């Protein structure tokens, strides 16, 4: 009961006195045995089980490594961002190309007032409209603390091309999501994608992907399994399935340098490739450099330079394909 009795037997209580709560009453003529030699011990608290973290989404498994690789640039691009309020922003994009068609895009973004974190607010509405009449739109909303939904649609010259509905549920130590793409009840076609990712330990997460597609005269299912191990300075991810294998390794050398290795094997194309990418961040110089090289002897690099106090960002990129003897370069300017 947490109480320690004195070494000497206590004097018997006077007759008729009520028993002291919390103590066992002693019958008349009996004495308590001596308890000398017992030392008080502090109450021991049972160790609490460490809760496993949420592993994120299945689509984020390879993202850390993918973000290190430069994005191919070609031609000249001008982007102008303008914030009209704390919730609404528009942007204009002009792209001039010597290979493809030059185009103009107008985009708008609305962020709602449902604040869930320092950088998260819902609902989010994103739209992009180009000079040919094509439209890309997304609506993202946090329905509850655990459920997030997204609707995306794409039109091309006033005709619906793609649309999909995503629903994601985040538990304490797992994430499950379902995506329905281009469903057509009359024709009997559509794509269904299911993802599940579970934290096994604080460092290890395992999951799987199921893709079911159906259209007239064709029906099939593709499955794949994924595993990700996260350490303080590196992350290794492996995805195995009927379509092939995909493995990435991300390593953070220091605050300025990050490295990534990617391996891809396609069972349908009977082809494999290995890529090495790195990112060098120099905050004092407002400089960000990304470079990559792969087994097909394609070398690429991009350089981004911010020009404070002006709201300007310069971007330059170049890619060289040694096998095909092709070279592409691009230049971009972002205002705002």
Swiss-Prot record:
What's one GO-annotated cellular component?
Answer: pore complex
Subcellular location(s): the record lists: Mitochondrion outer membrane
Compositionally biased intervals (Basic and acidic residues)? 42-52
Q: Where is this region: Disordered?
A: 1-58
Topological category with respect to the lipid bilayer: Multi-pass membrane protein
What keywords were assigned to this record?
A: Ion transport, Membrane, Mitochondrion, Mitochondrion outer membrane, Porin, Protein transport, Transmembrane, Transmembrane beta strand, Transport
Pfam families recorded: Porin_3
- Which CDD domains does the UniProt entry name for this protein? Porin3_Tom40
Where does the UniProt entry say this protein principally localizes? mitochondrion
What pairs make up the disulfide bonds? none
> What would be an example GO MF term here?
porin activity
**Bias (Pro residues) ranges:** 10-21
In its UniProt record, which GO terms are filed under biological process? Answer: monoatomic ion transport; protein import into mitochondrial matrix; protein targeting to mitochondrion
Similarity-based family: Belongs to the Tom40 family.
Summary of subunit composition and partner proteins: Forms part of the preprotein translocase complex of the outer mitochondrial membrane (TOM complex). Interacts with mitochondrial targeting sequences.
Known PANTHER family for this protein? Answer: MITOCHONDRIAL IMPORT RECEPTOR SUBUNIT TOM40
| Task of the protein | Channel-forming protein essential for import of protein precursors into mitochondria.
Q: What is this protein called?
A: Mitochondrial import receptor subunit TOM40 homolog
Q: Which organism is it from?
A: Xenopus laevis
């Amino acid at each position: 009961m947490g109480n320690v009795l004195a070494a000497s037997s206590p004097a018997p209580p006077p007759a008729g006195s009520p028993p002291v709560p919390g103590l066992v009453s002693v019958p008349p003529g009996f004495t308590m045995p001596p308890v000398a030699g017992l030392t008080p011990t502090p109450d021991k608290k049972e160790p609490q089980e460490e809760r496993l973290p949420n592993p994120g989404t299945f689509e984020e498994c390879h993202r850390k490594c993918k973000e290190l690789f430069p994005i191919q640039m070609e031609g000249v691009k001008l982007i102008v961002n303008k914030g009209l309020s704390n919730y609404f922003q528009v942007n204009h994009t002009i792209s001039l190309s010597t290979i493809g068609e030059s185009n103009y895009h107008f985009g708008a973004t609305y962020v709602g007032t449902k604040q869930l974190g320092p950088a998260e607010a819902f609902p989010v509405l994103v739209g992009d409209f180009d000079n040919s009449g094509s439209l890309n739109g997304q609506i993202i909303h946090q329905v509850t603390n655990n459920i997030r939904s997204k609707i995306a649609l794409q039109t091309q010259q006033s005709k619906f091309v793609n649309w999909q509905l995503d629903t994601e549920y985040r538990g304490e130590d797992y994430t499950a999501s379902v995506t329905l793409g281009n469903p057509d009840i009359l024709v009997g076609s559509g794509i269904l994608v299911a993802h599940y990712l579970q934290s096994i330990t604080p460092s290890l997460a395992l999951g799987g992907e199921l893709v079911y597609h159906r259209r007239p005269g064709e029906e099939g299912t593709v499955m794949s399994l994924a595993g990700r191990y996260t350490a303080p300075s590196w992350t290794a991810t492996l995805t195995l399935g009927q379509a092939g294998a995909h493995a990435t390794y991300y390593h953070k050398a220091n605050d300025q340098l990050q490295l990534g290795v990617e391996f891809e094997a396609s069972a349908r194309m009977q082809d494999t490739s290995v890529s090495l990418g790195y990112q060098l961040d120099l905050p004092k110089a407002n400089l960000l450099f990304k470079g990559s090289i792969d087994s097909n002897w394609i070398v690429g690099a991009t350089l981004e330079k911010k020009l404070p106090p002006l709201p300007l960002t310069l971007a330059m990129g170049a890619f060289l394909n040694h096998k095909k003897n092709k070279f592409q370069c691009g230049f971009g300017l972002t205002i705002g």
